[in-house]
């Protein structure tokens, strides 16, 4: 999870997040190279009073500065499209979880099981136990199995929300009247925190998300206790 004075991403806990981190580094490298080239040209222009008359109307230069940006955009677009398709495509999910945003809490429904649904509210500060995280703990955590493909169906009952778990690379808008889909899969057991990432009213900051990813055996035991 995030910690104080953190300027980078959280550690990736899902394949999608790993791909997003690689894409971030790839894009940042291109931006750094372009910035270095621009600064170099500016420094040359400021340090010399000579005018290169041969390049003021050169067909070769115009060709280069037309083709080169197109190539750079392609180098950015191709991996981006690949990740978009990876995030959207899901075949035969092992589990489907429906998430509904409300002002100002989340409700969850395990669509593969009858009557397995609950609301998830932020735990008030006076009710926190030692070691709990302020503004991030909830009364009902979402328990999911690891190493399984999970389909998330996300919508809203009132206004726009956004269901976001940074470590898993998920940020999907919850829109009233629309059912959006996201893919969740991780091989790392742990507790992952997120929050609503769309300003949705006075208590927007009090809509935490807590996922508890456990091995399949413990998930089945949790189901037996809950159902």
Curated annotation (Swiss-Prot):
Q: Where does Mg(2+) bind?
A: 198
UniProt-annotated binding residues for Cu cation A1: 161, 196, 200, 207
Single Gene Ontology MF annotation? cytochrome-c oxidase activity
Cofactors per UniProt? Cu cation
Recorded hits in SUPFAM superfamilies, A to Z, give: Cupredoxins, Cytochrome c oxidase subunit II-like, transmembrane region
Query: What Gene Ontology cellular component terms go with this record?
Result: mitochondrial inner membrane; respiratory chain complex IV
Identify the domain of life.
Eukaryota
For this UniProt record, the keywords arranged alphabetically read as follows:
Copper, Electron transport, Magnesium, Membrane, Metal-binding, Mitochondrion, Mitochondrion inner membrane, Phosphoprotein, Respiratory chain, Translocase, Transmembrane, Transmembrane helix, Transport
Which function does this protein serve?
Component of the cytochrome c oxidase, the last enzyme in the mitochondrial electron transport chain which drives oxidative phosphorylation. The respiratory chain contains 3 multisubunit complexes succinate dehydrogenase (complex II, CII), ubiquinol-cytochrome c oxidoreductase (cytochrome b-c1 complex, complex III, CIII) and cytochrome c oxidase (complex IV, CIV), that cooperate to transfer electrons derived from NADH and succinate to molecular oxygen, creating an electrochemical gradient over the inner membrane that drives transmembrane transport and the ATP synthase.
* Protein name, UniProt field: Cytochrome c oxidase subunit 2
Q: Which organism is it from?
A: Galago senegalensis
